Amino acid sequence: MPFCLLDVDKDIPEREQHIYIKDSKEPKGHCKQRCNTNTIPGSMTERGCAFAGVKGVITGAIKDVLHVVHSPVGCTAYGNGTTKRYPTRPEMPDGSVFPVENFNLKHIVGTDLTESDVVFGGMNKLKKVIREASKEFPFVNAIYVYATCTTGLIGDDLDAVCKEMQAELGKDVVAFNAPGFAGPTQSKGHHVGNYTIFEKLVGTKEPPKTTDYDINLIGEYNIDGDYWVLEKYFEDMGINVLSKFTGDATHGELCWMHKAKLSLVRCQRSATYVAKLIEEKYGVPYLKVDFFGPEYCAENLRAVGKYFGKEIEAEAVIKKEMEKIQPELDFYKSKLQGKKIWISAGGPKSWHLSKPIEQYLGMDVVALSGLFEHEDGYEKMQERAKDGTIIIDDPNTLEMEEVVEKYQPEIVLGGIKEKYFFHKLGVPSVMIHSYENGPYIGFEGFVNMARDIYTAIYNPAWKLMEFEEEEPGDSNE
């Protein structure tokens, strides 16, 4: 069996089932990597909570809603866009202009629960805060309210409060019941967000206009402008993005997703749920798509073009974009060929990126890992990895250090929480969740990512640093 127990895990042997060494001799699907389970006590990992999954991923990118976090101040601060960059434009689907650009990145409201609220309940305080927030920001089109661990434990009824406030204020007030402890990872928050939006919003409004080429772009959160890259491709193909879920989206777009002709699911871990539900109830089919790297981007633009009879337009976009990026791709491949890389993403990016990085940059992917991926995602990592690649679910800090020592990656694509840990080990790191200098999607985005990888590896600062095993004065001499 190709499972592996790392040296640092001798006291938590359960970790063996979470760590896999790729061996193509094993029958496909024979080794089911353990994942999406509670972190083992004593294993210090980098996961986020269910609240982070719903607010930090699913709803945080919507441009015209106000977020009210029912919590002590810590959770409110945590939910204030600290890990993602979700820019928005002020233009609205009906041609109007939202009064505050990047409103979703600038404002969040919390109930600032105290010990007294925990003892006596915080529902009256929540109502007061929603009323005050509505007066302060009367132009928002909806208010989203979030449960957290504290309010989940004391049993505050957010649904009842939101129903009352919606009737009073005359606008949608939506409760998202994903307290941090609701699941083992942020993935539970994705799930709750999908189902809440579908049950409470989808089908409740009609779009200003429709066309025969309308799509929902689901699981695209416009990290550092990713959506705007894809929007340009679709515009050139004559395809209209009717609704986004949820990058640069409006509240209304979520309500009329049922009117699209096709849904495209980009982040397949966080947003396939809502696409399935829309298909089941409204008959809107969906395609799972991948726009990371030139080959996958071209394949999926062709698939969309074929669905709408826009094959010629798709080929024109692919040809134009490849001609623009090929010289830069050739340069970065010449500089990065053979460099060892570890892709440590939250979920799908670990299998989205492994092949393009090998194919177009010539790099050697020695390790893959995920924080909240499910079994199907790890199967894709295993399929796309070469023999000998280590694949880790929910890696802890000591495991990361051991993998660096044994596999010697020259760069890590990871998150902000791990970035400076790897720096202390002398390994450059590029943020793959929220990016360094994005966008990273599509043809031009892949070049941006290659540039950031090149810049990180060849940064002359690394030559000026010494990484010692012992601090001065720690010797026993």
UniProtKB/Swiss-Prot annotation:
Residues given in the record as [8Fe-7S] cluster binding sites: 49, 75, 149
A single BP term in Gene Ontology: nitrogen fixation
EC number(s) given by UniProt: 1.18.6.1
Coiled coil regions, renumbered to chain: none
Catalytic activity: N2 + 8 reduced [2Fe-2S]-[ferredoxin] + 16 ATP + 16 H2O = H2 + 8 oxidized [2Fe-2S]-[ferredoxin] + 2 NH4(+) + 16 ADP + 16 phosphate + 6 H(+)
Domain of life, per lineage: Archaea
Record bears the keyword Iron-sulfur: yes
Cofactor note: Binds 1 [8Fe-7S] cluster per heterodimer.
Pfam families recorded: Oxidored_nitro (PF00148)
Keywords, ordered alphabetically: ATP-binding, Iron, Iron-sulfur, Metal-binding, Molybdenum, Nitrogen fixation, Nucleotide-binding, Oxidoreductase
Enzyme class: oxidoreductase
GO terms for MF: ATP binding; iron-sulfur cluster binding; metal ion binding; nitrogenase activity
Cofactor(s) needed: [8Fe-7S] cluster; [7Fe-Mo-9S-C-homocitryl] cluster
Residues given in the record as [7Fe-Mo-9S-C-homocitryl] cluster binding sites: 267, 433
Similarity comment text for this entry: Belongs to the NifD/NifK/NifE/NifN family.
Biological role: This molybdenum-iron protein is part of the nitrogenase complex that catalyzes the key enzymatic reactions in nitrogen fixation.
Subunit structure: Tetramer of two alpha and two beta chains. Forms complex with the iron protein (nitrogenase component 2).
UniProt name for this protein: Nitrogenase molybdenum-iron protein alpha chain
Species per Swiss-Prot/TrEMBL record: Methanococcus maripaludis (strain DSM 14266 / JCM 13030 / NBRC 101832 / S2 / LL)
Gene: nifD
